């Protein structure tokens, strides 16, 4: 009564009247309803949203938008609307003043509407000031207002058309004005305003249009259409990609995760937290709690010493990304509730078809309702998916960023526990797992909610019978739980095998040259395949489990339906299974199918993510290096006169290991030159590492004053140009740069390089010699102009007088660094007299310290050290024209040699150190070059660009790729799978059609006949579905494993068969990417996608068949809709495919850069370049996400459009059912509409899966890409196999031999004609680039000859297999490479030799004592790259390999250049005795080592200049003589 009085004076105006609104052929709302509800609904919406929206705007300021015509128009219209509403109000007041009685509604509604319009105008201005370009809240408000006004408009028009109607002219006119203004406001709200002032997108050359897109464009994903059109017309390139939105960049995402992880670590530890800063400010207080936001963002990761509990990474991820998931939660909840609208409307539609008296408009109303409901579901669902995918992308970005930052600060001990392979997997596979989970995580609560709601509605429909279905589901729970537990076990085992395989592949790729030289490819291939076999075993078990899982998931909804229907019809004869009950229940069962199907997938995804979560937590919880172990002081600190002060310090590599350095005490005054000398493994390199804070300080105090530069023993070179390697992120200062390059003896090298200092250096410096790499490493340190220089034996890898040049011009008292503090680890005793201080190390302690003269006078360990080497020289014999007069022990007979005052005791060592194969000191002095000349132009950019970026294929994935995959599976299994799929879906269709026939059975005496028959056949069809499901699931899973095995085998075999040039130009990141990410896709993703694709395809075909059978009129509409569908799908796939390829290609640099960083992490830390490398990594990740982000939006773009096509099928199926209701049975209507309701989902899944299929099959394409590259010559040729005892003599002939590195480059060796008799010892000398190493590459056929031939014992080596050749000759390479595994495996990977033979070789290589002392002896595990052995010990292992093989021909490629004098002596003496009857070819740096050789080859510019015995060549006074003279040998 209250509302009646509120709406009319006499209470005659009812609020609601069924006969007016519903039970009529011409429905309308009552006046009261129009004046209250239809006015109040839009007002209520805006007032409810206002406080939340205002709060949101207060916290999200995007900048200020200037007043535009659009904004002025919206504001003006807002005021006009307010005026119109209040005009209505004032008109009411005027009427009352005229004595007319008015109901309160005429005062309240205009007042409320007027105030709401003012609020709307206020919000329009607030949005403008906060930078909102298009508002969803306001657009929705205007839409609701218009829809409500539309109902009123229809009513007013209908009233006006009546003859006896009373018309209120003023209110009607104001309403028409109001309606027009609201309509214009709605239209204006569809457009976006201009960008805010000072917006970051203004300066962006290619901003993402999303930020400036209108609300409508955003919810329909229209803003990406431009890229889709472009991608359809021509393949997308990386330049076409838009910049990432600021909130998605690493710069925004990573620091938040790192900060939250830091807080979580702090909570889980007892001690206060310590922050590791990447700041370069040495005065920054460590562990300070008062840090601003920016500083916190720069904190790399947290060091937390004492454990209480493990920090929870899950909590951290939740805290960081929780708000995004809350948004997705809201969208998902709305969507889930809307899902159940379909079955309820279907129930009403079936009732309508059954009720022939119902007004016609109700059928059209239900159809419209079904369509609108489906469209709203579509928009809500894809906003949800978009949020999930973007959140997943951000999680991946954050995880990669956190792992990278952690890798920069992790201790060396922790680094050893996490191999490169494992860390790369954390970035590739584990980060991806989190990304995948983000999409499904809401299903944890959503799936049970959907199940509960479906069961509730089923209870209303079928009563207690539904409990039978619940019982079936409950029975399935323990089965699913067991499978989930098993899945986790298999997942852990799979990840472990994968880590081991990637680790081994990494090592193989890093040491590929050594593998080829030793012909060890097959041994390592077997090792990889053994690990792969374990991996495939686990995959096979997972496949069986997946088949059982698929069987239960597909069968569960059917079993639930069958058991429910069976109980329903059998418990009571009067229970009739009519169309409404059956098909509404079926629609609900179909809703039930999705959560039941997806839950196991979600569980599996959660299991995988939990494994990854644990791995990631363990890695991020590893201990960090303690930067406080070294006290850093600014260079201007007047209080400290010493640059380095160490007091009673003890250091260890790992907390639990015994100390490596004990009781170290010394100080170095500013500007001093200090040498660190000692035997192999005495702790020289460790001392430098300790000063770099790379070791754990157990006790003591260490102070370093000023900035530090570090040159490691093994040079670390980046895959960038030579110039960029030297500049290392610093500005180019041309004069100083030129001075550095000249001082480091790099000018002659720049002459040789195709593009001077702009030449790109391959990964790990593959296109530079060892000496060149070391000089570039030194130049980098010199150019950075630091205060303290830690130089770890930088002169060992260079020619001796290049060493002299570098010492004089860089390190020595007159060099570029003369005013700097220098700590030089060296084996070159000729430089020792010029040192200010010499530190003698022994057994991890400082045994002596003092100046050269002081140490000699003491006649202690240092004097003994010098005497040992002087006598060693004497024993080896003197060259004819050598220096005479060696004084007695300790006798200081002085002489001048090369401008250095040295004792005679050291004189012979000096001869040895300064002897060389080239004359750099002269060469360098002749170069006076500007940096413009250093940038010598190469023939073409391609000629000098060595490393190929990962390329993206373009265009459609070729059918041949699918065919290749089918062949890899096996054609029988492929066709069997398709046949089983077909059988399964035929059974499914027939069972549903059978159900419709059942529901149409006539009712006789309150019951249906043939119920038992109907039920039995229905059950039998269900069982046949189950059997075929299990069959196809098994077939696809097992076929997938066959394909994985075959594709991996082909890839591995081909990569190992590729020539060395392939590895030089292919970054290892590309190959690691193939063996990790792409192979993981083939292992896990493709079989799953095939099952889903085939299922979706048959579902769509089946649904169309049913709709056509039920309503033949649909034949008119299905073909055009199919055409639209096909067009949209092709449109999408063209762009999606290319985006996936671009994403794949941009992923490789992320891993390559990460690999590079891990190898050079100590250098990066020493130079304090962490920030720059973090920025580079972030940039590469962002580049990768730039391709990924459009691909996820494209997915949504497609889904929205396809679902609209699906919704049209729902609309027409319902419409035709309404039109044909008099000729259709309720059963067929139910069947048709229930299938049409599913079509949307099926279409969506079909396109999603077809695009997933195409984007994932790209992995096969990329694997095949490297399976079909060029191959080197066959390893074995049966017809041309040499005799088993070949070569017997060891005679080597070069006949007019020529060699070039690539077809488009000049010859590096020309017209080589030389014969080396068996048993001869031949030295090969020449300056850098003369072709010395090229000669050995030719001998081993690492590079094939361009002309001429090499004959060994009358056999042309080009005619025999590569392994036949390489097994018969042995090399001791310049870089000693070891692989992780046992020491025995490193010596004899094929297990050809007995333990006795191995021990003999170790004894002869002077390693027996060392190996015998190891706990595991021959089974001692070598670390990755042999890092747990010193360089000298590694070189001796290489010697032991040679002794074990004992071939007739031995090649030494500068094998003793990188070792100390003692190791050099050991190697030389062993070679002289053990290889006495062998042909020995030695590429020599130190001329004295070859002075007793039979003959010497002198190479220059790729040609033999001189050839003869050393004495003959000295008498000729040619090139060799000048070298010997430079070296002080004559």
From Swiss-Prot:
Modified residues (N6-succinyllysine): 503
A single cellular component GO annotation: basolateral plasma membrane
Keyword field: ATP-binding, Cell membrane, Glycoprotein, Hydrolase, Lipid transport, Membrane, Nucleotide-binding, Phosphoprotein, Repeat, Translocase, Transmembrane, Transmembrane helix, Transport
Known catalytic reactions: ATP + H2O + xenobioticSide 1 = ADP + phosphate + xenobioticSide 2; an S-substituted glutathione(in) + ATP + H2O = an S-substituted glutathione(out) + ADP + phosphate + H(+); sphing-4-enine 1-phosphate(in) + ATP + H2O = sphing-4-enine 1-phosphate(out) + ADP + phosphate + H(+); leukotriene C4(in) + ATP + H2O = leukotriene C4(out) + ADP + phosphate + H(+)
Domain spans labelled ABC transporter: 644-868, 1292-1526
Regulation: MK 571 inhibits sphingosine 1-phosphate and leukotriene C4 export.
Annotated gene: ABCC1
Intracellular or extracellular location(s): Cell membrane; Basolateral cell membrane
Protein name per Swiss-Prot or TrEMBL: Multidrug resistance-associated protein 1
EC number: 7.6.2.2, 7.6.2.3
Enzyme class: translocase
TM region(s), chain numbering: 34-54, 75-95, 101-121, 134-154, 173-193, 317-337, 364-384, 441-461, 465-485, 548-568, 591-611, 967-987, 1025-1045, 1089-1109, 1111-1131, 1203-1223, 1226-1246
Gene Ontology biological process terms in this record: cyclic nucleotide transport; glutathione transmembrane transport; leukotriene transport; lipid transport; positive regulation of inflammatory response; response to xenobiotic stimulus; xenobiotic transport
Residues annotated to bind ATP 1: 678-685
A Gene Ontology molecular function term of the record: ABC-type transporter activity
InterPro entries according to UniProt: AAA+_ATPase (IPR003593), ABC1_TM_dom (IPR011527), ABC1_TM_sf (IPR036640), ABC_transporter-like_ATP-bd (IPR003439), ABC_transporter-like_CS (IPR017871), ABC_transporter_C-like (IPR050173), MRP (IPR005292), P-loop_NTPase (IPR027417)
Membrane topology value: Multi-pass membrane protein
SMART domains: AAA (SM00382)
Native source organism of the sequence: Bos taurus
Domain ABC transmembrane type-1: 325-608, 974-1255
Sites carrying sugar chains: 19, 1005
Coiled coil: none
Topological domains, Cytoplasmic: 55-74, 122-133, 194-316, 385-440, 486-547, 612-966, 1046-1088, 1132-1202, 1247-1530
Tissues/organs with expression: Expressed in heart, spleen, lung, kidney, skeletal muscle, mammary gland and weaker in brain and liver.
Function according to Swiss-Prot or TrEMBL: Mediates export of organic anions and drugs from the cytoplasm. Mediates ATP-dependent transport of glutathione and glutathione conjugates, leukotriene C4, estradiol-17-beta-o-glucuronide, methotrexate, antiviral drugs and other xenobiotics. Confers resistance to anticancer drugs by decreasing accumulation of drug in cells, and by mediating ATP- and GSH-dependent drug export. Hydrolyzes ATP with low efficiency. Catalyzes the export of sphingosine 1-phosphate from mast cells independently of their degranulation.
Residues given in the record as ATP 2 binding sites: 1326-1333
Ranges where the record places region Disordered: 912-939
Chief site of localization: membrane
